[in-house]
Amino acid sequence: MDAIKKKMQAMKIEKDNALDRADAAEEKVRQITEKLERVEEELRDTQKKMMQTENDLDKAQEDLAAATSQLEEKEKKVQEAEAEVAALNRRMTLLEEELERAEERLKIATEKLEEATHNVDESERVRKVMENGSFQDEERANTIEAQLKEAQMLAEEADRKYDEVARKLAMVEADLERAEERAEAGENKIVELEEELRVVGNNLKSLEVSEEKALQREDSYEEQIRTISSRLKEAETRAEFAERSVQKLQKEVDRLEDELVHEKERYKAISEELDSTFQELSGY
């Protein structure tokens, strides 16, 4: 009987210890589950941030593409303006050369006009002195008069050419000034776009770094989840084992309690039989 009681007490203690271990395992499972939920929540937050970062990255790439396109368009316009300026410079050079030639022709015509005027004055003087001049003098006067008309025509043509060239030169200078203004405006716009492109590029690099860090954090969280899941599975296995041990011990305790009840009943029956025997012996 004492051995059975000691065994039952030992098994109860073992049962209590098993229950404590099961409770501890359940508490650990609960803690691990809570930690896993927190990690999963952090992972969801990180994924949301990554999604936002990817959206920001896409927008930055679109802004970069738009800025690059604008820059290329402005560079194209500046190249066209520079080509126009170069063409106007060539045209102005040609007009300046033409103006120089016109001035040279005007100078020659003026010299001829002065010479013809001088000859006319000389002829007029001679004509007045020699009223009865010869036919040769008259022919000379006609020649000089023809030279005078030619010189006047040349002078008028030179003046007309000079005015035309001067007018064209003024137009070209105005066109050149406007083209230079457009080229300067285009260059200023290119500087602005290059600065904007630099800012967008820096933002893009920052977003790429943020995305890389977010990916690293996601990998770290996934590794933590795998580790915690493994620990959770291990804890659940230990909890199941502890629960099976408790059930097994409970069955053993129940069996021993049944055996104890049976032994008590036998002890009672034997005691009653002994009492009855003693009473019978006492009657004799």
UniProtKB/Swiss-Prot annotation:
<comment type="similarity">
    <text>Belongs to the tropomyosin family.</text>
</comment>
<protein>
    <recommendedName>
        <fullName>Tropomyosin, muscle</fullName>
    </recommendedName>
</protein>
<keyword id="KW-0175">Coiled coil</keyword>
<dbReference type="InterPro" id="IPR000533">
    <property type="entry name" value="Tropomyosin"/>
</dbReference>
<feature type="compositionally biased region" description="Basic and acidic residues">
    <location>
        <begin position="116"/>
        <end position="130"/>
    </location>
</feature>
<feature type="coiled-coil region">
    <location>
        <begin position="1"/>
        <end position="284"/>
    </location>
</feature>
<comment type="function">
    <text>Tropomyosin, in association with the troponin complex, plays a central role in the calcium dependent regulation of muscle contraction.</text>
</comment>
<dbReference type="Pfam" id="PF00261">
    <property type="entry name" value="Tropomyosin"/>
</dbReference>
<feature type="region of interest" description="Disordered">
    <location>
        <begin position="116"/>
        <end position="140"/>
    </location>
</feature>
<comment type="subunit">
    <text>Homodimer.</text>
</comment>
<keyword id="KW-0677">Repeat</keyword>
